[in-house]
UniProtKB/Swiss-Prot annotation:
It comes from Nitrosospira multiformis (strain ATCC 25196 / NCIMB 11849 / C 71). HAMAP family: IF_1. Its main location: cytoplasm. Pfam families: eIF-1a. One of the essential components for the initiation of protein synthesis. Stabilizes the binding of IF-2 and IF-3 on the 30S subunit to which N-formylmethionyl-tRNA(fMet) subsequently binds. Helps modulate mRNA selection, yielding the 30S pre-initiation complex (PIC). Upon addition of the 50S ribosomal subunit IF-1, IF-2 and IF-3 are released leaving the mature 70S translation initiation complex. Belongs to the IF-1 family. This is Translation initiation factor IF-1. Keywords: Cytoplasm, Initiation factor, Protein biosynthesis, RNA-binding, rRNA-binding. PROSITE patterns: S1_IF1_TYPE. The gene is infA. InterPro entries: NA-bd_OB-fold, RNA-binding_domain_S1_IF1, TIF_IF1. The keyword Ribosomal protein does not apply. The lineage of its organism: Bacteria, Pseudomonadati, Pseudomonadota, Betaproteobacteria, Nitrosomonadales. Residues 1-72 form the S1-like domain. GO terms for cellular component: cytosol.
Length: 72
């Protein structure tokens, strides 16, 4: 079975929460809960409030996202 396509969006980190979780404000104004992807965790990429990030949303739960990239 093929996986469902993810929705990629741009956002900004609003606040840091425990367990590598962040509150992210998307371009369209929605606020979602985001967690760091495994590769970002492996390479110790730090994310701070105010950073611009790319997130992946699944069609199943649009209130949670996976943070896949931090803009420089």
């Amino acid at each position: 079975m093929a996986k469902e396509e993810t929705i990629q969006m741009q956002g900004e980190i609003l606040e840091t929460l425990p367990n590598a979780t962040f509150r992210v404000k998307l371009e369209n104004g929605h606020i979602v809960l985001g967690h760091i992807s495994g590769k970002m965790r492996m390479h110790y990429i730090r994310i701070l409030p105010g950073d611009k990030v790319t997130v992946d949303l699944t069609p199943y739960d649009l209130s949670r996202a996976r943070i896949t990239f931090r803009a420089k």
